[in-house]
Swiss-Prot record:
Binding site for ADP: T13, R17, T268, G311, G412, N416
Residues reported in the UniProt entry to bind sn-glycerol 3-phosphate: T13, R83, E84, Y136, D246
Classification via Pfam families: FGGY_C (PF02782), FGGY_N (PF00370)
Entry function: Key enzyme in the regulation of glycerol uptake and metabolism. Catalyzes the phosphorylation of glycerol to yield sn-glycerol 3-phosphate.
Catalytic activity, EC: 2.7.1.30
Catalytic activity: glycerol + ATP = sn-glycerol 3-phosphate + ADP + H(+)
Activity modulation notes: Inhibited by fructose 1,6-bisphosphate (FBP).
GO cellular component terms listed in the entry, alphabetical order: cytosol
PANTHER family on file: GLYCEROL KINASE, SUGAR KINASE
Protein name: Glycerol kinase
Organism expressing this protein natively: Francisella tularensis subsp. novicida (strain U112)
BP terms from Gene Ontology: glycerol catabolic process; glycerol metabolic process; glycerol-3-phosphate metabolic process
Superkingdom of origin organism: Bacteria
Length: 500
């Protein structure tokens, strides 16, 4: 049977998805299922790792069935995943010892504060992992599990526990425990991986008291990791041939193969990445240095700005405040008024990411008067997404010395034309939206397809992408500067709110 399709496994923060692509990049079928968000305490966020696997395996089978594609027609599987979220499980039983601790979770802030008391070690972490010390990353989450789950430390020291980011957890289950591996992009998000020597950093592991025996093998982003177990997908042994964290996969899906090319993904969070080539660039502006992907043992590096809350603020005004009935309604209400009338909403629900890195910042609405209506709050929530993206992209310009020559965008929120136009205005730059909005999944299948020869080279990948719409700035630079000053003032009000 001919291998006409590639399956993207897209495991996100709020849902598990499976997308079947053909050779022209067309989508044959998408299946999606949401799963439970667990909030045990304020600032804590967890997922049930078994529910993640259950929903993910379920949507894979659903996509094949309703897409009328047989497992034998799948040339390869590409995995892309929510990053930093980490699972620790029993090597023998495959059972997690605790829920997955999600990237948004702030429970390890006190551990990070302890690390920050040693400036030399903080410097070592930045220079060798490319990251800042923050509860966002996997390393301190693993330490917390080992220190707080009964018996976990003893089992880990005895070599009985394994850890991994979500890609590793899925690969383990897809292969029924035959493969314990991750890729360079996901490894670079743990705060445990040395992006210069390209190996797990023993000094950091020792500091956090994490046994190296727990850690997965690190492989190229485009490489055959193994094959699915015959019991997993209808008896077929399908190569798992592409793996990348969601934002890295999106950069690859946008075909940002050249140095200086950038993209922004608008999902639960908001993430901008710029390809900086084959050597890491370290930021003075609060950006992260990360591995975008690796091929043949050679990494491509990127600068990244991470915004914790983007699309999630629209979920909040829908579910938490009841201001809209659907996310789509937000555009309607935002366009009923000409401005926010001086209202700013800073969605620092779990702190602030780039460039502020304030774990203790909290959400703030400022500028409210007796005339403030729900439309102003809704519009301010949308504008906050664009302002946060501008914060990040301004830092990239400072670190690289490059002006932003257009931005490629993807994610659910790019369907909101008001947001995209406001983003173009506030950046004073062109915004390009591709016809294929499933860029993250596309990046995963591009990586997998190259590994198995489904596509011959990157030039062929570029021919698959086409632009749907280009947004041009419609607001003058002086007005933009005035509005942005207001945003920066609002951010200052939100800082250090939850500090002990």
């Amino acid at each position: 049977m001919s291998k006409d399709f590639i399956l993207a496994v897209d495991q996100g923060t709020t849902s598990s998805r499976a997308i079947i692509f053909d050779k022209k990049g067309n989508i044959r079928k998408i299946a999606q299922k949401e799963f439970t968000q667990i909030y045990p305490k304020s600032g804590w966020v967890e997922h049930d790792a078994m529910e993640i696997w259950g929903t993910q395996s379920g949507v894979m089978r659903e996509a094949l069935e309703f897409g009328r594609v047989k497992p034998d027609q799948i040339a390869a599987i590409g995995i892309t995943n929510q990053r930093e979220t980490v699972v620790v499980w029993d090597k023998e039983t495959g059972d997690p010892v605790y829920n997955a601790i999600v990237w948004q979770c702030r429970r390890t802030s006190s551990i990070c504060d302890e690390i920050k008391r040693d400036p030399q070690f903080v410097k070592y972490i930045k220079e060798n992992t490319g990251l800042v010390v923050d509860a966002y990353f996997s390393g301190t989450k693993v330490k917390w599990i080992l220190d707080n789950v009964e018996g976990a430390r003893e089992k880990a020291n005895a070599g009985k526990l394994l850890m991994g980011t979500i890609d590793t957890w899925l690969i383990w289950n897809l292969t029924r425990g035959k493969v314990h591996a991750t890729d360079y992009s996901n490894a670079s998000r743990t705060m445990l991986f040395n992006i210069n020597s390209l190996e797990w950093d023993k000094k950091i592991l020792d500091y956090l008291n994490i046994p190296e025996s727990m850690l997965p093998e690190v492989k190229n982003s485009s490489e055959v990791f193994g094959v699915t177990d015959s019991h997993t997908l209808g008896g077929a042994e399908i190569p798992i041939a592409g793996v990348a964290g969601d934002q890295h996969a999106a950069l690859f899906g946008h075909c940002c193969f050249e140095k200086g090319m950038a993209k922004n993904t608008y999902g639960t969070g908001c993430f901008a990445l710029m390809n900086v080539g084959d050597k890491p660039v370290y930021s003075d502006e609060g950006l992260l240095t990360t591995i975008a992907w690796a091929e043949n043992g050679k990494p491509t590096y990127a600068l990244e700005g991470s915004v914790f809350i983007a699309g999630a603020v629209i979920q909040w005004i829908r579910d938490g405040l009841g201001l809209v009935r659907s996310a789509e309604d937000s555009e309607y209400y935002a366009t009923k008024i000409d401005s926010t009338n001086g209202v700013y909403l800073v969605p620092a629900f779990v702190g602030l990411g780039t460039p502020y890195w304030d774990m203790y910042a909290r959400g703030t609405i400022v500028g409210i008067t007796r005339d403030t209506k729900r439309e102003h709050i809704i519009r301010a929530a949308l504008e906050a997404i664009a302002y946060q993206a501008k914060d990040v992209l301004e830092c990239m310009k400072e670190d690289t010395g490059l002006d932003l020559a257009g931005l490629r965008v993807d994610g659910g929120a790019v369907q909101n034309n008001f947001l995209m136009q406001f983003q173009s205005d506030i950046l004073q730059s062109e915004i390009s939206k591709p016809k294929i909005n499933e860029i993250t999944g596309l990046g995963a299948v591009f990586l997998a397809g190259l590994a198995v020869g489904f596509w011959k080279d990157k030039q062929e990948l570029k021919s698959i992408l086409t632009t749907e719409k280009v947004f041009e700035p419609q607001k003058d630079s002086q007005a933009v500067a005035h509005d942005y000053r207001g945003w920066k003032k609002a951010v200052e009000r939100s800082k250090a709110w939850a500090e002990c």
